[in-house]
Structure formats: C-alpha cells, structure tokens
Amino acid sequence: MRINKFIANKGICSRRKADELIKEGKVKVNGKLVIELGLDVNEKDNVEIDGIESLESQNLVYFMLNKPKGYICSSSDEKGRKTVLDLVKTKERIYPVGRLDYDSEGLIILTNDGDLAFKLTHPKMQVSKTYVVKIKGQIKESELAVLRAGVKIGDVKYNKCKVKVIATDKNWTKLSIVLFEGKNREIRNMLDFIGKEVILLKRVAISELKLGGLSRGEFRPLKDFEIEYLKNI
C-alpha cells in the first residue's frame, strides 16, 4: 500500500496532506526518513509522523459544517486564527475536506476517512461544488460567457463552470456558480478578472449533498445514506 494511503487510512489526514508531510521531512518508516512519495508499506512497518503520538486506526466519522466567515479550513494556523476544528467537537482526529477561504462560508465536510477525502478533492473525480455568490452591481451576458468558458489568469487556467443569475437588484447581483475543480480562491479570482467585487460567497452543495437549513457555525454528523452517496459518486 502506498504510504500516503496508509496514513490516510489511519485517519491522520488526507492523501494529499500526507504527501505534504513527506515532502516536509516529517515521516519515517522503520526509523528511516521517507523521501519517496510512492513508497509501499504494510501493517508490519513502523510508520512515525512528527507530532503524532499514535497511528492506531480510528473509527471513521463524517460531519457537515456550515463554516462562518473568519475561520480557516485547516487543522492549525501559524497565525493563530480560528480553524474549523474549533467548531466541531469530537474525540476523533478529523480534518476538513477541501477548503473555503477565510472570508467565505458554507458547506464543509470534516472526516478522518482519507479515501473519501481523496475522492471528493482530486481533480480527476470532477465532483461538483455549488456556490451562491453575491456581487456588487450588474453583470452582462458577455461577462457570464467569459466565466462559463473558463479563463486564464497569469499561469493559472480556470476551467469551464456553470454560472447563472438567480436574483438581481440595482446595486447587486446574485449568482449560482458550479465548479468542477478546487483551485485556491477560484471564484474570487475569476470574478475579479471581469471586474466584479464579491460581497458574499457561500458553498451550498457538494454534488447532491446540500447544506440545507444548518445555521452558521453549526455542525451535524452525516447520515448513513449521505455517507454512502458520497462514497459512490
């Protein structure tokens, strides 16, 4: 088994985060520093991670959180800012799946299931994420067409997305935006590219899993059928 999957299966972090820990020189196998991301290990190997006292397997848990503004999607923050883990109380060691930036809000899944985290975040899986975005002013059909076609900003290519106007006023416009990838600050950067200022950015669904009536800052365990649905996307 590849070492990143081994670590993820123990509920430590996602496969992607495990790769980061290896690159940072924080993982040892049988006393030797791991330098190969694709290293194969098994249960007989002694795997150590800096700062983690035990790699005993945990019960898998799954939570939905309505993240408020002012929290970061990380297990810790070197700047001392509040993280989403401050809002979800559980004895299991969990981590957020994907991210919402500091000033955004809405649906975040937290779990210790590394395989599910991998499935929901890997670009090749094309799992849709739906957002409600409120911007200042109006938006032209030609500008919507630019967003739908995808844009390149510097060296970063943002792929096609689904965009439609769902409400409008003389001072603002509310959009529904569906993404199929998860680049950092993707929506904000695309809207800035066409000269639009974001007032509100809220994720309301991951594939067909919807935030529903969960209040800001509240969380709940995912129901069995929701977990099965996500695993079978």
What are these language model-derived features?
Residues 1-233:
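Basic, flexible Lys/Arg- and Gly-enriched helix-loop patches that mediate nucleic-acid binding at interfaces
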